[in-house]
Amino acid sequence: MRDPKERLRDILEAIAPIDRYRRSDRLRQTLLDALLQQGFTLVNGQLVPPDPSCKDNIRQLYVHLRKEKLQEAGSWLRSVEDKVLPYFANGAEVNVRRIHPVLEFVDSQFKADLFRYASLLWSVPVSAGYGRRMRFLVWDEYNGKLIGLFALGDPVYNLRARDQWIGWGASDKNERLYHVMDAYVLGAVPPYSYLLGGKLVALLAASDEVREMFQKRYARQASVFRKVVREPHLVLLTTTSALGRSSLYNRLSVSGRRVFISVGFTEGWGHFHFSNGTFEQVKAYLREIGDPVVKQYKYGGGPNWRFRMVKRCLIHLGLSPDLLHHGIKREIFVVPLASNARAFLRGEETEPVYYEMPKDSLFEYFKHRWLLPRAARDQRYQAFNRESIRLSRRLNEEG
């Protein structure tokens, strides 16, 4: 019996015949094959994404992108693995009552290598971020091992739920989006992930220390294109869940105040499912046919530009732009760092009134609210062996 995917390809070719000697048709076949491999199916003559209400289906959409990223990193990964792996704890090295987190800014090649290696561990590949970027490692001072990592970067320009929560008009947003950063990487690594370390990392991203480092890093700096020097007041973080509704950020409160506030969901459109080795082909094709969108990249337009690139390519290839609808509705969170964050971002107040959120106070709250109760009822972390996350082994197994 023939593979179901082969039968689907036959049906698709009958709908839109493919000349394999034409570059456009070869690219069209490549894109369709990639979608089929990620779980898209043919319904009433249309390719539709897998059911996004099932988190396993969502993970399947990411499988090929993650595999591609591992393969791209192969030679680098093998060159650094033995250097970075000892900085991941074995379960026996974790003393729950003596954990003490320390924040470290990524400012060296070794730290960058450790950050990159750790981010490749997750089942959902992480973005490289856009524009301004600040990356952090979170260490356990007691044993010198890595707890987790996070990164802040420029936020996307178009995010309706965020803009509605703030109460932004276009002119206010253009003027004050500078004071917002997006947490595009946020999570813990094992064995700390077993101990709800992701909640700790999320809280630390909102700490006074991070906000103060932002102010120091961007003080007296002119913006890239407008050459405007602004006071670097970081008053709001945003982030989105990877797999629909988030259990990590929901109910993440400190002393009765909700730190991460859910403001809605994305609409399930994007280009990530065209990023698994095909985006460069898309860009090369558009450049070859002279589509002006290739040259339209501008500051702040990173993800939107990629979206437009893929959309234009689909149209040129005779495919529906609806293929950009992957169906994954990510939950959107805002993290106000000041009690008057919304008024400040609307231009109604000139100085932010910051919450007091020192790192050590946040950890003490996390320790008693989540860490110690979790460690008492779930001892899986104790059996963790860092060799189980050796990525070169996974790379060899996946070919």
Segments (PLM) and residue ranges:
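Solvent-exposed interaction patches of small proteins and small membrane subunits
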Residues: M1-D10, A14-Y21
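Short, mixed-charge, low-aromatic patches
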Residues: M1-E6, Q71-S75, V156-D163
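Extended effector regions of multi-domain proteins
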Residues: L32, Q38, G45-K55, R59, ...
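Acyl-donor binding region in acyl/amide transferases
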Residues: V102-P125, G131-I289
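Non-catalytic, regulatory and substrate/membrane-recognition segments associated with hydrolase enzymes
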Residues: I15-A16, R20-L32, G39-F40
